[in-house]
A protein has these predicted regions:
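Reductase modules of NAD(P)H-dependent flavoproteins
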Residues: 1-80, 229, 233-348
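Short, surface-exposed secondary-structure boundary micro-motifs
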Residues: 50-53, 85-87, 138, 188
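Short, structured interface segments
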Residues: 69-92, 181-183
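Short, Lys/Arg- and Gly-enriched loop/turn segments at beta-strand edges
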Residues: 89-93, 141-148, 169, 190-197, ...
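Ferredoxin-reductase
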Residues: 94-182, 236-238, 263-266
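Short, conserved phosphate/pyrophosphate- and ester-handling motifs at nucleotide-, phospho-/glycolipid
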Residues: 130, 210, 299
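Helix-loop module immediately N-terminal to the HCX5R catalytic loop
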Residues: 181-192, 281
């Protein structure tokens, strides 16, 4: 049995098979709805249910009208009418499962590892700047990491991994990983990408390894000879946590359209740059965010607070806020009322 999915206030309809989620059905039909973790944690895919009934995994049946239904977890019980944040016709890159070889391991800080992977000779995996891959572990578990390389270099992948004590991958597998070892990865996933049809100024916010997908996007913009205005705010505890701050500073010197503002929450006395929380630094410089697109990647606290502050005090509409919130593996499925935002998930 299949049900009909209708997108409210549009002429878009598509079928959804029994036990298929709304997100999966949309992708099968050639439509793209924002998502990230696909596990019901990040809420990137949250949308409204205007009419009909859905079963949300881990929750009871939901009847319209409802807000913030996790479409990656929602299975129709009837024909339904939905109101996703965004929906677009898009032909995504073909997803591939690849045995990748560890090419290089660098540790710019005690807790950050830059992991360069290479794919078999002649094999490329096209992706959009800002997307992520899944590392498939031998027991069937998985971890998600943003790709920091640009799409022009799609014969491998660069991952920025923050070590978390007790982390299944970051603190266990990574500790013994050596050059020449292999990892099985699947890619690409995610919707944390610039809209190619827009030329509006962009503000990026990053905390920690949230810099990874932004690096991919900016290097893609450089390769495409774009002149779209971009301002990156990268928040960290101290200068050491800005593990590739010299690269961002180099972009700022070389590209007239790019600005870089590092923000430290625990600065030393010699620091003369921005201090505090990265979202507050943005508001200090841009009290009015109308006419801009905002992309936030990093801790869930930062992305959630940025959305709240920007929409309530800086005139930013929610459809212009895009986020990728890193959340630990194993978090429980968020209830439909959760307000936390997106996630290309740095996992442990």
């Amino acid at each position: 049995m299949s049900y009909q999915i209708t997108v409210a206030d549009t002429d878009i309809t598509f079928p959804c098979e029994a036990a298929q989620t709304v997100l999966d059905a949309a992708e099968t039909a050639g439509w793209s709805i924002p998502y990230s973790c696909r596990k019901g944690v990040c809420t990137t895919c949250a949308g409204g249910l205007r009419t009909g009934e859905l079963t949300v995994r881990g929750n009871d049946t939901v009847r319209g009208p409802q807000h913030d239904v996790l479409l990656c977890q929602a299975v129709p019980c009837t024909d339904v009418e939905i109101t996703p944040k965004r929906i677009a016709s898009r032909r995504p890159p073909v997803r591939k499962t690849i045995t990748a070889t560890v090419y290089r391991i660098r540790r710019p800080t005690r807790r950050i590892t830059l992991l360069d992977l290479r794919f078999p000779i002649g094999l490329r995996a096209p992706f959009r700047a800002g997307q992520y891959l899944t590392v498939l572990l031998p027991d069937g578990d998985s971890r998600l990491y943003s790709m920091a390389n640009s799409p022009q270099h799609n014969d491998g992948a660069q991952l920025h991994v923050r070590t978390e004590p007790g982390g299944r991958f970051s603190d266990t597998t990574l500790a013994t990983l050596a050059t020449g070892d292999t990892l099985t990865v699947e890619l690409p996933y995610g919707e944390f990408s610039l809209d190619p049809d827009s030329d509006e100024p962009v503000i990026f916010l990053a905390t920690g390894t949230g810099f990874a997908p932004i690096k991919s996007i900016i290097e893609d913009q450089i390769a495409r000879r774009s002149d779209r205005t971009i301002h990156l705010y990268w928040g960290a505890r101290d200068e050491a946590d800005l593990y590739w701050g010299d690269l961002a500073a180099h972009w700022a010197r070389q590209q007239p359209w790019f600005r870089f503002t590092p923000v430290l929450s625990r600065p030393t006395r010699t620091w003369n740059g921005a201090t505090g929380w990265v979202q507050h630094a943005v508001l200090h410089d841009h009290p009015d965010l109308r006419g801009r697109q905002v992309y936030a990647c990093g801790s869930q606290q930062m992305t959630t607070e940025a959305l709240t502050h920007f929409t309530s005090t800086a005139e930013l509409t929610e459809d212009r806020f895009h986020s990728d919130a890193f959340v630990p593996s194993g978090d429980p499925v968020a209830p439909p009322s959760a307000t936390a935002r997106p996630s290309s998930m740095e996992q442990t």
